[in-house]
Design a protein with these regions (language model features):
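N-terminal pre-Walker A segment at the start of P-loop NTPase domains
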Residues: 1-10, 221-242
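Charged, amphipathic alpha-helical linker segments immediately N-terminal to NTP-binding catalytic cores
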Residues: 197-232
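Conserved inter-motif catalytic segment of the P-loop NTP-binding fold
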Residues: 50-129, 275
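Conserved nucleotide-binding/hydrolysis micro-motifs of P-loop NTPases
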Residues: 58-62, 90-95, 119-121, 150, ...
Length: 275
């Protein structure tokens, strides 16, 4: 069985095992980080020796490579090793020509395929219900055809969180919704794990950032069953404190309450506990 990774530690833990055939839908507002996440998944699996194909209808290759290089994703390097290929398909093509070209590319032995974005393709056939249904069915079956990981990127209008791609939400294995908003004059990024087939969703939403030379970092809160066992016993040197609480252990969480007018309140308590 082919196994894949997301390439982001926090997400790998939430999603669990990714076994082919597998489909991930990445949806989000413009600028939310969809292309960055799709590229991260590609890059992480290419480093494991899996061939990745990135099909784009918008992105410029040089611009994408340059931006990802700043995030620590060396796409040129894996391209030179034959593990990454970027193909831009202009929307001026007829939809049948685009699918024919995708079919030819799929036959070249790729394990990971990104389509950025499926929204653009569906927009072309918006008025043709039968063609739209046929196109969606094609992408349903695609990961089975090449027995690998398919990553679909979808655009969400600002202010909306509904994907609006029809039944595709029911057949994909994982759905990530990327969001961003302004809080206290700062940009806050959130990732919602809306669906992960075969894994319980213990944490549905987490903060993340996109850092230079690092890429995507997801800040997942601890899951209750993963809280470590109590550490070694500690006995406070302060006799008064010792008489009140006895002892405590490394890893304990201690709530300290004191009146605001107490002299050296917080500093004094921290000094006592640190001994």
């Amino acid at each position: 069985m082919k196994r894949f990774v997301i390439g982001v530690p926090g997400l790998d833990k939430l999603v669990g095992e990714v076994v082919a055939p597998y489909t991930i839908l990445i949806a989000g507002h413009p600028g939310a980080g969809k292309t960055t996440l799709a590229s991260t998944i590609c890059y992480a699996n290419a480093l494991k020796g899996e061939k990745c194909l990135y099909i784009s209808l918008y992105e410029d290759k040089e611009k994408l490579f340059r931006y990802m290089e700043r995030l620590g994703l060396k796409l040129r390097e894996i391209e030179s090793n034959g593990l990454f290929r970027f193909v831009k398909l202009p929307l001026t093509f007829d939809i049948n020509m685009i699918i024919d070209e995708v079919g030819k590319l799929v036959g070249e032995g790729y394990s990971v395929i990104v389509v950025d974005s499926i929204t653009a393709l569906l927009e072309v056939v918006r008025e043709n219900v039968e063609k739209r249904a046929w196109l969606l069915n094609y992408f349903y079956q695609l990961p089975v055809l090449f027995n690998g990981l398919l990553i679909l990127v979808s655009e969400l209008p600002f202010g909306e969180e509904r994907i609006g791609l029809g039944s595709i939400e029911f057949v994909v294995d994982s759905i990530f919704i990327l969001k961003h908003r302004i809080e206290d004059h700062l940009l806050t990024r959130l990732i919602e794990v809306r669906k992960t087939r075969g894994s319980p969703i213990n944490i549905a939403e987490a903060y993340f950032t996109i850092a230079e030379n690092i890429g995507i970092v997801v800040f997942t809160p601890p899951i209750l069953q993963e809280i470590p066992h109590e550490g070694e016993e500690l006995v406070p040197i302060c006799n008064a404190l010792k008489n009140v609480i006895g002892h405590f252990h490394k890893g304990f969480i201690i709530n300290v309450f004191f009146p605001p007018e107490a002299p050296m309140g917080r500093e004094a308590i921290l000094a006592i506990l640190s001994t």
